Design a protein with these regions (language model features):
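Phosphate/pyrophosphate- and phosphate-bearing ligand-binding catalytic cores of soluble enzymes
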Residues: 3-156, 172, 176-184
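Recognition helices and adjacent regulatory flanks at domain boundaries
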Residues: 167-168
């Protein structure tokens, strides 16, 4: 009914602003998890010699926690607005233009409909903004999607940083990036 998918649901589309979710119930499977797992988890298991034929939920939890700790700032130490921008959707023509300019190592995911998803963190990094303070906010040096608070005093500082990042990325690549968190 809610059309849940990765970072999406009706609450971001047709039901946006109509409901306020106060609780949820989740039914978990008692069966062992089955791969394939996302690439970072697969790599973690390979690098740590963990066989994936009989993997447990606890092993997946530990892998994801370690991967996130390596990629994201510790919220106990560094305040942030979290993962702040969605990965952008671009046309095949835009993807080809980026490949011509930057080679084939661009983080692109083929959506198999003539469009590609591109890492917005990569765009922010290549725009020269990773680790640069803007209005008291800073795209984190480990993951440019995460906006850390260096000296911002209020929402207005965050909004100014957001708009400047969007403008610079649009100016450099011609790609609109979109804020992930909903404002209420």
């Amino acid at each position: 009914d809610c059309e849940f998918s990765y970072r999406d649901s009706i609450f971001r589309r047709s039901a946006a602003g109509k409901y306020f979710i106060t609780s949820i119930k989740i039914k978990l499977s008692k069966l062992p998890p089955k791969g394939p797992f996302y690439a970072g988890v697969e790599t973690y298991f390979q690098n740590n010699n963990i066989p994936t034929d009989n993997i447990t939920a606890a092993q997946i939890l530990n892998a994801v926690a370690k991967i996130r700790a390596d990629k994201l700032p510790d919220p106990k130490l560094i305040p942030s607005a979290g993962s702040f921008f969605k990965n952008a959707i671009i046309s095949a023509k835009q993807a080809d233009g980026l490949k011509d300019a930057y080679g084939d190592k661009i983080p692109l995911f083929d959506l198999n409909d003539g469009r590609y998803k591109i890492s917005t963190g990569w765009l922010i990094d290549k725009a020269g903004l990773k680790g640069v303070e803007l209005h008291g906010m800073c795209p984190h040096f480990k993951n440019a999607l995460v906006l850390t608070n260096v000296s911002a005093r209020n929402f207005n500082d965050l909004a100014l940083a957001r708009e400047e990042i969007k403008s610079i990325v649009k100016g450099k690549f011609g790609i609109e990036i979109e804020q992930e968190p909903l404002e209420i």
